[in-house]
């Protein structure tokens, strides 16, 4: 790779910019076609880059898909962790669910990536499972900071809530659970409050 600046940008900056274009194209295509509809050729066409630049940043299509998934996961988890874990437990839960549902409504592409099953892709299935555990950890941290810890700890109830909320949000996104975002956040809060006994 050249070490010269080009149009005022270093080689590293140009690589990073191309990677961002590829990630944006992958996000768009995945949200439109599902993960199995994403191809190296399609990503290159959408980003306006050649496959040479694709392979500069990613080993293969799966590496791109994992990077897109990680970006969505990190953004959603970051928003959840920004919710103040203080106050009445139900208020904390409601704030977390409102934050999550608002984020999904703000960028529906994230909803498809975060809440559709990646069946047929072992790498994506593993990553999605790991994300479920990470979000459950955030929920457990938030709830345990404002509510008594139930017998047996908070991990099991947190996993149960996150899985159930994921199913409810998936049904909502598919139009099978009619509700406003506010009603959905309230339903999620009610269900999880019962699980945690608060």
Question: Which sequence ranges carry the predicted segments?
Answer:
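C-terminal peripheral helix-coil segments that are non-catalytic and often amphipathic
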Residues: 1-5, 102, 141, 171-198
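N-terminal intrinsically disordered/low-complexity leader segments
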Residues: 1-17, 147
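Generic hydrophobic, amphipathic alpha-helix propensity
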Residues: 15-26, 43, 68-76
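Helix-turn-helix
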Residues: 21, 29-63, 67
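Hydrophobic alpha-helical connector segments
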Residues: 67, 81-109, 185
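Secondary-structure edge/capping motif, primarily at the C-terminal ends of alpha-helices
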Residues: 80-84, 114-118, 146, 172-176
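Amphipathic alpha-helical segments used for helix-helix packing
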Residues: 104-123, 140-143, 170
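Amphipathic alpha-helical packing segments from all-alpha helical-bundle domains
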Residues: 122-147, 152-167, 190
């Amino acid at each position: 790779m050249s070490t010269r600046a080009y149009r005022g940008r270093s080689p590293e900056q140009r690589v990073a910019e191309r990677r961002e274009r590829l990630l944006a194209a992958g996000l768009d295509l995945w949200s439109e076609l599902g993960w199995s509809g994403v191809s190296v050729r399609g990503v290159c066409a959408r980003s306006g880059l050649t496959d040479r630049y694709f392979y500069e940043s990613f080993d293969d299509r799966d590496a791109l898909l994992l990077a897109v998934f990680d970006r969505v996961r990190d953004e959603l988890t970051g928003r959840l962790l920004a919710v103040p874990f203080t106050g009445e437990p139900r208020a904390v839960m409601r704030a977390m669910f409102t934050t999550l549902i608002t984020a999904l409504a703000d960028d529906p592409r994230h909803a498809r990536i975060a809440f559709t099953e990646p069946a047929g892709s072992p790498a994506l299935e593993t990553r999605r499972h790991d994300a479920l555990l990470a979000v459950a950890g955030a929920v457990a941290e938030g709830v345990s900071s404002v509510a008594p810890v139930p017998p047996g700890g908070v991990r099991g109830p947190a996993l149960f809530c996150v899985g159930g909320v994921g199913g409810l949000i998936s049904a909502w996104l598919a139009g099978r659970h009619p509700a406003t975002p506010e009603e959905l956040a309230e339903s999620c809060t009610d269900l999880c409050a019962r699980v945690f006994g608060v």
